[in-house]
């Protein structure tokens, strides 16, 4: 796999669009408004960070260790933050709610890591 980040963002984008379509057309009559709101929030953050990983993966910074930390943090953050919101929407145990802020923290780590990596980069 030459660029694993491109493969992962392609899959993330696919699942984001698929779940969004399923939520809009198949779940809107089944789930309560609160559950649909959790799905919408998860989708919003998933797509936003998928695009962020894509941008960094295609940039000159992609081989910078802090940029790689950013992309990894965002991808794991998607799994934890968005994934926990999806699970809550489908009535998973409320214990999973404690995973959501860990994913959000990983999003923040990714952004500050990218800022630091770009600041310290001599090639930009």
From Swiss-Prot:
A Pfam family cross-referenced in the UniProt record is DUF423
The main place the protein resides is membrane
The topology of this chain with respect to the membrane is: Multi-pass membrane protein
Cellular component aspect of the GO annotation: plasma membrane
Please name the InterPro entries in this protein's record. DUF423
Query: What is the top-level taxon of the source organism?
Result: Bacteria
Where in or outside the cell it occurs: the entry states:
Cell membrane
Q: Which UniProt keywords apply?
A: Cell membrane, Membrane, Transmembrane, Transmembrane helix
What are the transmembrane regions?
6-26, 70-90, 95-115
Family in the record: Belongs to the UPF0382 family.
Give the protein name, as stated in the record: UPF0382 membrane protein HI_1073
This protein's species is Haemophilus influenzae (strain ATCC 51907 / DSM 11121 / KW20 / Rd)
**Which lineage?**
Bacteria, Pseudomonadati, Pseudomonadota, Gammaproteobacteria, Pasteurellales
């Amino acid at each position: 796999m030459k660029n694993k980040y491109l493969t992962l963002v392609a899959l993330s984008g696919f699942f984001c669009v698929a779940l969004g379509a399923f939520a809009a057309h198949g779940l809107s009559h089944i789930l309560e408004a609160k559950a649909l709101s959790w799905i919408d929030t998860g989708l919003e953050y998933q797509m936003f960070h998928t695009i962020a990983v894509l941008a960094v993966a295609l940039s000159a910074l992609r081989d910078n260790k802090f940029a790689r930390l950013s992309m990894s943090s965002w991808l794991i953050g998607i799994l934890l933050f968005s994934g926990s919101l999806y699970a809550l929407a489908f009535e998973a145990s409320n214990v999973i709610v404690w995973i959501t802020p860990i994913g959000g923290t990983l999003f923040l780590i990714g952004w500050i890591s990218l800022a630091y990596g770009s600041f310290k980069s001599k090639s930009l």
